[in-house]
Amino acid sequence: MLDIKWIRENPEALDAALAKRGAEPLAQSLVALDEKRRSAVQKAQDLLSRRNLASKEIGAAMAQKNSELAEKLKAEVSELKTLLPAIEEEDRQLTAELNDALSRIPNIPFDDVPVGKDEHDNIVTRTVGEKPRWNHAPKEHFEIGEALGYMDFERAAKLSGSRFTVLTGPLARLERALGQFMIDLHTSEHGYIEVSSPLMVRDEAVYGTAQLPKFAEDLFRTTDGRWLIPTAEVTLTNLVREEILDQEKLPLRFTALTPSFRSEAGSAGRDTRGMLRQHQFWKCELVSITDAESAVAEHERMTACAEEVLKRLGLHFRTMTLCTGDMGFGSRKTYDLEVWLPGQNAFREISSCSVCGDFQGRRMNARYRGKDDKSNKFVHTLNGSGTAVGRCLIAVLENYLNEDGSVTIPDVLLPYMGGLTKIERAA
């Protein structure tokens, strides 16, 4: 959420930032709504002040035995008490209306973010590795998995409908190995604290990370009103909600390996075959809680941590700087890691690492106490996939495919595979 004081002082800057994102100007309507709210607040404060003063004057009038003045003041206090509830209700309604409007405004992009409309305007920041060179034809992951006999979409559909997958035998183990490798890397070498947290959260949590109120249709909700997490970003970031941290203890770095649940409401007709776009998938999430000064450097560090996963797996990938039109709602700057999929003859997103400024900190009322001036400031937050496990599985299948249809296990995963070095067709 943006600071209304900043919007009041910088209306042109807000509208310019919204224009970069392809959104309509909002500063004028927000400032007008804020003026109405502030007027209602002032009215309520004036009435309260006059009521309190009149109450004191009653005592003085009584002490002076001026009963006529005392009665007049009592009548005034009574009238003020009658007026106050309506003014206070107006204040509450206008405050709620303003907060709702602010909660639907996207974050302000950094100045160095390329301006663009969609993914076609993203910039290649760096490319790592090379495409595999084979004598045999590449295949898509679902062709490989089904031919091996360990990837079953038909039974998954019988259980749950479309956009689900059943993995068995060595493919199930490979998925588990990938997730375990990621968690081990980030905790043992990258300094992240592993967290086991709930998969269902309250409204306040998804509001804090900015999925609510704007993106409710992308989420799954339980009958008792809780939300299935679309990413562990929600739980990891909200660990510090309503807290005041010491600046000396920052940054906090959390990681979790969890299922994620997404309705894919806007994805009809996209990636309908295979595992690329699922309602339920495993993901290793990275979250950092920092002060204002450290956030940009932390963003580069987090992205490097995610890249290291792909480097150690020997996968060809590129890092993209997203343009303003392709960035997430809460982001100030985002790097996407796109892994090469030979079967699709294309790069596909496997990780997204974003720096959010104090956008989420303000929504969560999460603050830190400055080590010098001791004032409380909103924390800055970052999140990234380190990485999406299912998409990593896809990349391994397509990049480590052998001519006979078997799949070689990447060396870094061998300690997790119980002696298995290759996945071959089921007997």
UniProtKB/Swiss-Prot annotation:
Positions that bind L-serine: 231-233, 285, 385
Catalytic activity reported: tRNA(Ser) + L-serine + ATP = L-seryl-tRNA(Ser) + AMP + diphosphate + H(+); tRNA(Sec) + L-serine + ATP = L-seryl-tRNA(Sec) + AMP + diphosphate + H(+)
Binding site for ATP: 262-264, 349-352
GO BP annotations, alphabetical order: selenocysteine biosynthetic process; seryl-tRNA aminoacylation
EC number: 6.1.1.11
Location(s) in or outside the cell: Cytoplasm
UniProt keyword annotation of Metal-binding present: no
Protein's pathway: Aminoacyl-tRNA biosynthesis; selenocysteinyl-tRNA(Sec) biosynthesis; L-seryl-tRNA(Sec) from L-serine and tRNA(Sec): step 1/1
Keywords for this protein: Aminoacyl-tRNA synthetase, ATP-binding, Cytoplasm, Ligase, Nucleotide-binding, Protein biosynthesis
Gene Ontology terms for molecular function: ATP binding; serine-tRNA ligase activity
Broad class of where this protein is predominantly found: cytoplasm
Record-linked InterPro entries: aa-tRNA-synt_IIb (IPR002314), aa-tRNA-synth_II (IPR006195), aa-tRNA-synth_II/BPL/LPL (IPR045864), Ser-tRNA-ligase_type_1 (IPR002317), Ser-tRNA-synth_1_N (IPR015866), SerRS_1_N_sf (IPR042103), SerRS_core (IPR033729), tRNA-bd_arm (IPR010978)
Example of a GO cellular component annotation carried by this entry: cytoplasm
Free-text note regarding domains: Consists of two distinct domains, a catalytic core and a N-terminal extension that is involved in tRNA binding.
Family: Belongs to the class-II aminoacyl-tRNA synthetase family. Type-1 seryl-tRNA synthetase subfamily.
Subunit field text: Homodimer. The tRNA molecule binds across the dimer.
Function in brief: Catalyzes the attachment of serine to tRNA(Ser). Is also able to aminoacylate tRNA(Sec) with serine, to form the misacylated tRNA L-seryl-tRNA(Sec), which will be further converted into selenocysteinyl-tRNA(Sec).
HAMAP family on file: Ser_tRNA_synth_type1
Name the record gives this protein: Serine--tRNA ligase
Gene symbol of the encoding locus: serS
